[in-house]
Amino acid sequence: MAKAGSGALRGRYTRWLAALLATAMLVGAGCAQLAEEERELTFRIVPGTASWYDGLPAGVQEADLPVDDGGKTQHIHAWWWPAETADAPAVLYLHGSRWNLTGQAFRIEELHDFGFSVLAIDYRGFGKSDGKLPSETTVYQDARVAWKRLAELEPDAARRYIYGHSLGGAVAIDLAAWLSEQSAKSGAAVPVHGLIVESSFTTLADIAEALTSPWLPMRLLLSQKFDSLSKIRELRMPVLIVHGSGDNYVPSRFSEELYAAAPEPKKLLLVDGATHNNCMRVGSAEYRAALEELFGLEPATADSSAGS
C-alpha cells in the first residue's frame, strides 16, 4: 500500500462501509457487488506503466509462470534479476497494492544492490499478469507458484529468502507460515532461510479501523482478512520486521505488534525518519547491519556494489 492518497482512501473506506452496513440491514447477508468493491479497495490497482519507471534494468530476465485457475491455466508475470556472484542469496519479492512491477522497480533494485538475486512477480490482475481483480486467495496462490520457481532458480534453501512490502508483507507472512506448516508435517527442514517484512500491518481489519472508525465491526464486515498477526506466530524461520518512523499511512505500531507476536529468532528495525516507501534508502546502513546480524549475510554479500 502506498502512502499517497491516504485521505481519499479513508473517505472511500467510510463510504463503502456505510453502503455495506445498509445492505446488511436490508437483506441480512453480504452482497457480491460489495465484496467485489472491497477487493477493488484493497488492491487499488493502477493500470499501465508507472510514471517514474526508467525501463527494465539491465540483466533482468522476464518470464510468465503458469497458475492453475480452476482447471484453466493463467500466467503471472515475473522478473528474475540474478546477482553477479554465484553464491548470492536469492529473495522472492512480493509487492503491495496499487503499483505493478514497473512501480516497484526502485525497491527491487535496492534489494539487488544489497546483494540479492531477486525474483519479483505481479499477482494476477496486476501489470502483464493474466486475470482482472485479485483476491486474498489468489495472491496467496500466486506467491506459492512463485516460490516453487525460486526454489528451482536457487536450489540451496540456506540462500532463499522471502520479502514482502506493505500488503505484500501479509502475502509473505502467509507463504512463510505455509512453508513452516508443511515442514512441520513432513519433519523436513524449512526450505527458506529467512523472512523480511517491511511497512506492513497486523490484519486488514486493523488497518481499515485505523483509516475509519474503531467502533465499526471490521472483522465481521471484511471478507479479505490478511491476518498476519495469527500466522506470524507459526513461523519456523528468522524474521526481520522493518518500518519507518515517519510512515503516516501504516503506523509503525503494527510492526511492533507483529514483532511481539513472532517467535525467535527475530529483529525489529525502526528506521528513523523513513516513510512508507523508503526504508532501504534512508536506513541503508542499518538495514545491511540487520541482514548480517539476523541472517548471517556477510558484509561483502550485502555490499552496495554487488550486482551493479
What residue ranges belong to the model's regions?
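Catalytic histidine neighborhood in serine/cysteine hydrolases
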Residues: 261-277
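Membrane-embedded segments
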Residues: 73-149, 153
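Primarily recognizes the serine-hydrolase "nucleophile elbow" in alpha/beta-hydrolase
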Residues: 149-153, 158-213, 223
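Acidic catalytic loop of the alpha/beta-hydrolase fold
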Residues: 246-250, 277-278
